[in-house]
Amino acid sequence: EDNLDQRYAHATGESVEEVWFLSKHVASSERPCLTVHPIGVPHLSSEEKPPFGGRSGRAPPPSPRMSAIWRSLLKVADDPRIPDFEVSLEVTHHGPWMTTPCAFLEIGSTDSTWGHPGAAEVWLDVLCELLGDEFEGVQSPVLNADLPVLITLGGGHYAPRANMMASEPHAILGHMLARHSLLFDQGPDGEVGGTWREAVDEVVRSTRAAHPGR
């Protein structure tokens, strides 16, 4: 559902700084996996209805901690509790809409793995380590203004280029647009159209919103 951050803040009086959705991942491959990704449907025109929520042409700010989550997940990729699981980033896709920085943290890809105890324990360890480090004074990536923030364009859904770049500690990952979200068409006069330009502009705006002052 859209605007969960605002609705929670209104109901509780508490401000919402960041949202992590612990969710199920669905894939036709049915491979067991743990995935991380930002959300949004910036490639859709205003006439198109998003099939899985969100606002057409918009992308919520990505979690500034997404790269840190990914690096922590890589550390436990060979954990014996998840012997058959792969780990991967995914590109920006689906809803809901919100204005608070967010990310989806998922277990996939079928009902036989959605309730996998080892996968749930690994995710718990990843998040506890990340938050525990911050509580103990380790600098949050949100506060490190010296690190560049990256946006990736092109490639497939599982973002192999972003997987590699975000594994390094010297950069922060923002939105990722796969080639299927960069829609081009050519008019009769040869001019290139499509929603690709609007999609790029939106993820740049959204990523900047997640990192004010950069």
Q: How should each PLM-predicted stretch be described?
A:
Residues E1-T99, T110-D111, P117-E121, C128-A162, ...:
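N-terminal catalytic or cofactor-binding beta/alpha core of small enzyme domains
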